[in-house]
Amino acid sequence: MSSAVTPSDQGLLPRGPIALEEFVKPFCDRFGLTKLPRHMHVILLSALFYQIINILSPVISRHLSTHYAKLSKKTRLNWDAHVVSSVQSIVLICLGYTCLKEVNAFPDKLFGYSVVAGDIYALTAGYFVWDLYITVRYVHITGIGFVIHAIAALFVITFSYRPYLMYYGPTYLSWELSTPFLNIHYFLDKTNRTGSKFQMINGFILIVTFICVRIAWGWFSAYSTAIEILNHINVAPWALSLFYLAANMSLNCLNLFWVSKMIDAIRRRAHGEKKSTPLQVTSEYAKKNI
């Protein structure tokens, strides 16, 4: 009997060890995560990849910027997190069209699934596994709120492997379009270029991109997702449906809050004010400006 992989079985990455899938299957089955074992190796490899980037960041950053060595330990930690965030956003931006093409072929918006889309979401899940590790390890610096955020993000992604609501994943991946500009804004702050012409141009692009993908497109998709959930409220477990509704609204409300903070920060930087905002947006929605 042929063991060739059919197109429907072909993922973004080669399939992982069957032994790993069989090892995690009983746990996944307990929560109805029937598609998760197939992608567990991608999650683990992704988390390892981002940890390697985090380890390499101090070495690379010292060569690229003389400012890095002068930063406090807390600020270097945050700098490295922004480096990892930048890499993650570029990866997801590059895969965005592929993911959109995959989900548009789903016959069912609620329970649609493909191996390729599952692998792309697994890359994101791996990032949040890494993020959870970092926020727990440095909870005295990041605060408990970021630990909770990492857990919530992992929960949302993980339970898409029932499968459930994978169709709407590209909306949240598209949010990463604003992340490179946001991280550039952060790096300019930390290299004494606050209020520079470059930062103002970048800030303008950041605001426009953020409003387009996270506010306009984000809220439209939030409405579409909510309608889909409510129209099938008795099909999926009600607790899961309510959680996704709450998470969906919370993330989009946070985006409104963050964009107001960003506009205020850019306005003050345009006037050369040195005082930093209490909160600064990142790809995880808020990193302390330390």
From Swiss-Prot:
Name recorded for this polypeptide: Uncharacterized TLC domain-containing protein C17A2.02c
The TLC domain, residue ranges: 74-271
Q: Which GO terms describe its cellular component?
A: endoplasmic reticulum; endoplasmic reticulum membrane
What is its membrane topology?
A: Multi-pass membrane protein
Give the transmembrane region(s): 40-60, 80-100, 110-130, 139-159, 166-188, 200-220, 238-260
Q: Where in the cell is it found?
A: Endoplasmic reticulum membrane
Kindly state which keywords UniProt assigns to this record, in alphabetical order: Endoplasmic reticulum, Membrane, Transmembrane, Transmembrane helix
Question: Which InterPro entries does the record associate with it?
Answer: TLC-dom, TLCD
